[in-house]
């Protein structure tokens, strides 16, 4: 079979990235056309995005959604298993982003080199009866290894950390970056967007509104009582009865458990988490592009409280979280909830710090 011009080289290059045995040396041998050679004709330059844990429950759906994002020009999909299959599947979508797959520890550095945004959903999922802290022993080591790769290969990338428990893994990542001398607190972002999405959805149900018209600030952390919806600051301005406040707060805090139990051992909140992760990643990319007033909630290094990390609204820009907003006025219910959240968060953050320092 004959191909015109450089078509054969392009096809060979793309095919190489669908094979688990791919190496940079193979790319150099198969093509002299460079990294951008198989970008869609006429496509915008866009950004280079890596998903670490792309073959997992969250990762597969997230890979699909990021392939659809017009701001992505190059999408690297990394995992320790099944990365070639996910890469092949997603690569058949006729959108502009070029997809490249990477399999196993030996290819981690290649997956990360030159990335603008790194999204990390890697780790084991929650199962019935498990808390996010039950995941710590396994996921802590995974996050450490991946962040060591980030520090070495793309130290200037913005990192979106999804791996649970986020209240601890963000601290782990920070300590890894500090050891490597690459830590920039503005660029390490714990993803809490699903808490906001749930809050918007559940509040909209109570108010009889479209969730897209509702904005609920959710502060604190990303587990149980550390998730604190500020219902007094809901937009559009609304009032709730004490029973509604109790119902909404409890449901938002336990949204993950609701899904785990509903799936009866068949998984966790992978679909809604992938949606939330893609939404937050898109906000980060718009910030990188220089869009004005890109505001989302995120678990970040913060001086809002005495804790080293705290989830609040942040303004995203070219350097990451360029502004961290204060909490604003709280009612008595929220002030009590804040103290409970801080007490729980302090231990979780310290657990992450100790994992690296001890």
Swiss-Prot record:
Keywords: Glyoxylate bypass, Glyoxysome, NAD, Oxidoreductase, Peroxisome, Transit peptide, Tricarboxylic acid cycle
GO MF assignments: L-malate dehydrogenase (NAD+) activity
Binding site for substrate: 126, 132, 164, 198
Entry-linked Pfam families: Ldh_1_C, Ldh_1_N
GO BP terms, alphabetized: glyoxylate cycle; malate metabolic process; tricarboxylic acid cycle
GO cellular component, one term: glyoxysome
Organism superkingdom: Eukaryota
Reaction catalysis annotation: (S)-malate + NAD(+) = oxaloacetate + NADH + H(+)
Gene3D superfamilies per UniProt: Lactate dehydrogenase/glycoside hydrolase, family 4, C-terminal (3.90.110.10), NAD(P)-binding Rossmann-like Domain (3.40.50.720)
SUPFAM superfamilies: LDH C-terminal domain-like, NAD(P)-binding Rossmann-fold domains
Active-site feature positions: 222 (proton acceptor)
Protein EC: 1.1.1.37
Enzyme class: oxidoreductase
Transit peptide residues according to the UniProt entry: 1-38
Subunit: Homodimer.
Family, per entry: Belongs to the LDH/MDH superfamily. MDH type 1 family.
Name of protein: Malate dehydrogenase 1, glyoxysomal
Native source organism of the sequence: Brassica napus (Rape)
């Amino acid at each position: 079979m004959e191909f015109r011009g450089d078509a054969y080289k392009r096809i060979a290059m793309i095919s190489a990235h669908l094979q688990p045995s791919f190496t940079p040396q193979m790319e150099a041998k198969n093509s002299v056309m460079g990294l951008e050679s198989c970008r869609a004709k006429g496509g915008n330059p866009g950004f280079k995005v890596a998903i670490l844990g792309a073959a997992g429950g969250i990762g597969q759906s997230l890979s699909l959604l990021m392939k659809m994002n017009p701001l992505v020009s190059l999408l690297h999909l990394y995992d320790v298993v099944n990365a070639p299959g996910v890469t092949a599947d997603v690569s058949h979508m006729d959108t502009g982003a070029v997809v490249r797959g990477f399999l196993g520890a030996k290819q981690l550095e290649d997956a990360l080199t030159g990335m603008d945004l790194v999204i990390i959903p890697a780790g084991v999922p929650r199962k019935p009866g498990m808390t996010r802290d039950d995941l710590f022993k396994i996921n802590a080591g995974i996050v450490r290894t991946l962040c060591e790769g980030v520090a070495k290969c793309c130290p200037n990338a913005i990192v979106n950390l999804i791996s649970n428990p986020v209240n601890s893994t963000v601290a782990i990542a920070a300590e890894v970056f500090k050891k490597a001398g690459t830590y920039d607190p503005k660029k390490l972002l714990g993803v809490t967007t699903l808490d906001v999405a749930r809050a918007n959805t559940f509040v909209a149900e109570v108010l009889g509104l479209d969730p897209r018209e509702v904005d609920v600030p959710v502060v604190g952390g990303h587990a149980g009582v550390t998730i604190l919806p500020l219902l007094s600051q809901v937009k559009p301005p609304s009032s709730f009865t004490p029973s509604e406040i109790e119902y909404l707060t409890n449901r938002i805090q336990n949204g993950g458990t609701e899904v785990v139990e509903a799936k009866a051992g068949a998984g966790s909140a992978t679909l809604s988490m992938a949606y939330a992760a893609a939404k937050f990643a898109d906000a980060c990319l718009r910030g990188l592009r220089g869009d004005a007033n890109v505001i989302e909630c995120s678990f970040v290094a913060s001086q809002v409280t005495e804790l080293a990390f705290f989830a609040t609204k942040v303004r995203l820009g070219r350097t990451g979280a360029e502004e961290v907003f204060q909490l604003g006025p709280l009612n008595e219910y929220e002030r009590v909830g804040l103290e409970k959240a801080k007490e729980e968060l302090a231990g979780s953050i310290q657990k992450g710090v100790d994992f690296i320092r001890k």
